[in-house]
Each structure stands twice: as structure tokens, then as C-alpha cells.
Design a protein with these regions (language model features):
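Membrane-interface "cap" regions at the ends of multi-pass membrane proteins
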Residues: 1-32, 61-66, 70-83, 87-91, ...
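Helix-loop-helix connectors at the membrane interface of multi-pass transporters/channels
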Residues: 2-4, 78, 111-140, 241-244, ...
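Membrane-embedded translocation segments of transport machinery
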Residues: 2-7, 11, 169, 173-321, ...
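Inter-helical loop and helix-membrane interface segments of multi-pass membrane transporters/permeases
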Residues: 5-8, 37-41, 76-95, 108-165, ...
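Select transmembrane alpha-helical segments in multipass membrane proteins
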Residues: 10-21, 45-49, 87-101, 147-152, ...
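Transmembrane helix-boundary motif of multi-pass solute transporters/channels
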Residues: 13-53, 235-238, 249-252, 256-259, ...
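Membrane-water interface regions at transmembrane-helix termini and the short interhelical loops
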Residues: 37, 41, 67, 88-103, ...
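A generic transmembrane alpha-helix motif of multi-pass inner-membrane proteins
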Residues: 379-401, 423-457
Length: 457
């Protein structure tokens, strides 16, 4: 348990918390994973399901994690251990704490790819980026990918090194408004392309014929990516939240911000790809191939493609950085609390871990391509381990902590501190005690089954 008594860092107020939490949620998963899933699982019906889940499942988890953090003023390990010495409580805290430590290294590798593409667009090499084989050639080049990866890591670490207010909050206040403006500009340009309206209709208008159970499962899985739940981030950020900051109002603002950016991401990508492909949603492939192969081809066939490419990858870089900052801060907070170290020493340690683990993922498509775990490259394995296994378990642990250990009454007291009432109390109670754990179990089993080929998602 954390026995180190020192002043806890804090956000300056509600705006600082909301922008930092929203920045954590708006990452690479929102920019390329959300549009891909929306295209694959029914467009408008997927969007509708996602919004409903954000207002219930996502809302309840954000509120719970933020309340736990503010109540204890500790990072995940100390927060869980504040309520008892059980080994299960310790395990619940540590799994929340370890997740960001494992995610941020491989996440930074992809961030490095974004830097490379942004540089090439600035140099005017949009045609080169659209060529078949360019992406595979780049990621198999160990030196080039490692250099870009290290640059991304150094930017992230430098911001964390500066502290909560001078680093995280200040950067979020600059990056998030720019990100919004860029997303609006690109979305407007995308939806006005010839043939793009079919993509707009597919994405925004629900069609019950496209509904399937897998649409629900996929939308639930996207919740983890989009809202940064079950990563320890919101517990950490909650511990920096002032008592006079409304948890419920802040959560609502994060929901609005995240949903708006997710919709913008869909409008940036789906209509443009529809116009490029003649209305074939299958062109929206999964994973890196969408952002680093398909999108450059789309931009190469558009007027002002180079300019749009620069704006798009600048937007993606900002989104990647705001999320990597949140992930890294959660890890640093754990080291500060559990090891009694200062911010600078803790930041250096996570920087070393990022470089060490990230290098495995970075070289996994090149010099280390022959080395696999469960048939997966290093990056794919770390992604599977954290997102498909650890995060659902962390969510279940948080739900059990709230409903079985702390008690929903005490959590409610923390939520309504300084408030007249808990407006979505009934939704929260039903979700956190019953439905959220069930949803997390469904995600866990379906993701593992899909990874081993037992089902196809």
C-alpha cells in the first residue's frame, strides 16, 4: 500500500480534467478503428448502438473510476488497496496499473509511423506514400521505424516530465481545440467529394437490416478504446480532480467530446473512402492498412490531397500524443505512489520501459519478424494481451470493487459531493452492479475466441 506522504498533483479545475480525460479517449482507436468497425458492422446501426452504450456502459465506468480516484487520491494500486489488504484487491489494482505500461510502448510505435507519414506529406511525397508496398517496406526497415518511434517517445516523455499542470493540462488545452478544428475541416472536405453522400448516409442513418449481435459486441469493445476505461487512466486522473469539480458533469462533457470526435472521424474517412471505392465499404480495411495504405491512396486521388494529408496526419499525431500522454501519466503515477519516487525519476523509468518494449514491437515487422508469440508479431501480441484479455478483467475488477467492497452508497456520496443530486443514479446502479460486468465478460470471451479462430468477428 502507498505509504509515501506527499502533496498530490491536481488539475487546475474542470476544464483541465475534461480536456485531459477527453484527450485520453481521443486516440488512434477513434481515428481508424471506429470508422472501420462502423463500416464493417452496419454503419448507422453501429453508431446508434455505440452512442447508447456510451451513455450507459461508458458513462458508468467513467463515473466509477473517477470517483475511486478522487476518493482515495491514489493511482490504481493504492486506490484498490485503500479498501483492504486482500490479495484480490491488490491484483485488481495492479492489473489496472500494468495495462498502460504495456500499451504505451507499442502505441508509440504506431505514433512513430504517423510522424513518418506527416514528414513525407510535408516533403510533398504524397504519390510515394500511395504506392503499393510503401508501408510494408517502411515498417520492415528497422532503422527508420526505430528512429521515428524514439522521437514519438521523447515527445511524450518530455510532456510528462513537465508535470500535470505545466505538461499534461497545458498541452491538452492547446492540442484538443486544434484537433477539433482539423477534424471539422477534413470532415467537411470529405463529405463534399463526388459520391461521398452515399458514405454519409451509410454511416449516419441506422438500418435495422444491418443489425447483428456482433454489432453490439464490436461496439462494446470499442468502448474500451474510445473512453479509456479499464486502463487505470481515469482512476489516476480522478485522483488529480478537485473536490469541487462535478464528476457527473465532467463525465457528460467527456462523453460529448468523445462521441463528437468519433462521428467526425467517421465523416472524415467513410465518405472519402466510399467516393474513392465507388461505394464499397469493404475498402475500409482493419488496422494500420486503413490509415497507412488506403487513406494515402484516397488522398492521392483527391484535389489538394497533399494539404489534406498534412492536416490529417497532424490531427492523428495530436490524437496519438494526447492518448500516449494519458497512458504514460498513469504509469508514472503508479511509480510515484508505489516506489516513493519523484516525477522525474519515475518518468525516466517509464521512458526506458517504452524504448525497451517498444523496440520489440518496432522490429517485429523487420529484423525480428521470425519471432512470434502465439503466432502473433510482438505488436499484435501486446495489443491482444492488453485489449482482449487484461482490460475486460480490469473492468470486472472495478465493478466488483464498487459493488461488493466499497458499496455503491459510498461511491454515490463521492459523486454528489457539492451536487444537489445524482441525475443518472438508476442507470449507474444497474450498469455497475449487473450489466457492466456481463458486458466485460462477453468482450473477454468473444475477443479470445476470435483470436484463436473459434469465432469470426
Amino acid at each position: 500500500m502507498n505509504k509515501h506522504n506527499k502533496s498530490r498533483s491536481s488539475f487546475s479545475g474542470k476544464i483541465g480534467y475534461v480536456l485531459a480525460a477527453a484527450g485520453a479517449s481521443v486516440g488512434l482507436g477513434n481515428i481508424w478503428r471506429f470508422p472501420y468497425l462502423a463500416a464493417k458492422y452496419g454503419g448507422g446501426i453501429f453508431l446508434l448502438i455505440y452512442i447508447l452504450l456510451a451513455l450507459t456502459f461508458g458513462y458508468s465506468m467513467i463515473v466509477a473510476e473517477s470517483a475511486i480516484g478522487r476518493m482515495t487520491r491514489k493511482s490504481p494500486v493504492g486506490a484498490f488497496q485503500s479498501f483492504g489488504k486482500s490479495k484480490w484487491l491488490s491484483a485488481g489494482g495492479w492489473i489496472n496499473a500494468i495495462i498502460p505500461i504495456l500499451i504505451v510502448p507499442y502505441y508509440s510505435v504506431i505514433g512513430g509511423w504517423v510522424i513518418k507519414y506527416l514528414i513525407e506529406y510535408v516533403k510533398g511525397n504524397s504519390t510515394l506514400l500511395a504506392e503499393d508496398g510503401y508501408f510494408s517496406g517502411f515498417i520492415s526497415n528497422g532503422v527508420s521505424t526505430e528512429l521515428c518511434f524514439v522521437v514519438f517517445c521523447l515527445i511524450t516523455v518530455a510532456i510528462i516530465y513537465a508535470g500535470v499542470r505545466n505538461g499534461i493540462e497545458r498541452v491538452s488545452k492547446v492540442m484538443m481545440p486544434i484537433l477539433i478544428v482539423l477534424s471539422v475541416i477534413i470532415a467537411v472536405y470529405s463529405v463534399t467529394r463526388p459520391g461521398a453522400l452515399a458514405g454519409v448516409k451509410y454511416f449516419l442513418v441506422p438500418n435495422l437490416k444491418n443489425f447483428s449481435w456482433m454489432s453490439v459486441v464490436a461496439a462494446m469493445g470499442q468502448m474500451f478504446y474510445s473512453l479509456s476505461i479499464a486502463m487505470g487512466i481515469l482512476i489516476t486522473f480522478g485522483s488529480y480532480m478537485k473536490k469541487d469539480t462535478s464528476i457527473e458533469d465532467s463525465t457528460r462533457n467527456v462523453e460529448i467530446f468523445d462521441t463528437a470526435i468519433a462521428i467526425m472521424a467517421g465523416l472524415m474517412i467513410i465518405p472519402a473512402v466510399f467516393a474513392f471505392s465507388g461505394g464499397n465499404p469493404d475498402t475500409l480495411q482493419a488496422g494500420p492498412s486503413l490509415m497507412f495504405i488506403t487513406i494515402p491512396k484516397v488522398f492521392a486521388n483527391m484535389g489538394f490531397g497533399t494539404v489534406i494529408g498534412i492536416l490529417f496526419f497532424l490531427l492523428v499525431l495530436f490524437a496519438a500524443l494526447t492518448s500516449s500522454i494519458a497512458l504514460t501519466e498513469s504509469a508514472v503515477s503508479t511509480f510515484e505512489d508505489e516506489l516513493g519516487w519523484g516525477r522525474k525519476k519515475s518518468t525516466v523509468l517509464i521512458g526506458v520501459i517504452m524504448i525497451a518494449l517498444g523496440t520489440l514491437s518496432c522490429l517485429g515487422y523487420g529484423p525480428l519478424s521470425s519471432v512470434t508469440i502465439l503466432g502473433m508479431q510482438f505488436l499484435d501480441f501486446f495489443d491482444f494481451l492488453t485489449n482482449s484479455v487484461m482490460m475486460p478483467i480490469a473492468a470486472i475488477a472495478t465493478c466488483l470493487l464498487v459493488s461488493r467492497v466499497i458499496g455503491v452508497a459510498k461511491i454515490e456520496e463521492e459523486i454528489i459531493h457539492g451536487e444537489s443530486r445524482f441525475r443518472r443514479k438508476k442507470i449507474f446502479l444497474v450498469m455497475i452492479q449487473y450489466l457492466c460486468p456481463v458486458f466485460a465478460l462477453i468482450i473477454l470471451f468473444s475477443s479470445v475466441a476470435n483470436a484463436f479462430g473459434w469465432i469470426t468477428m
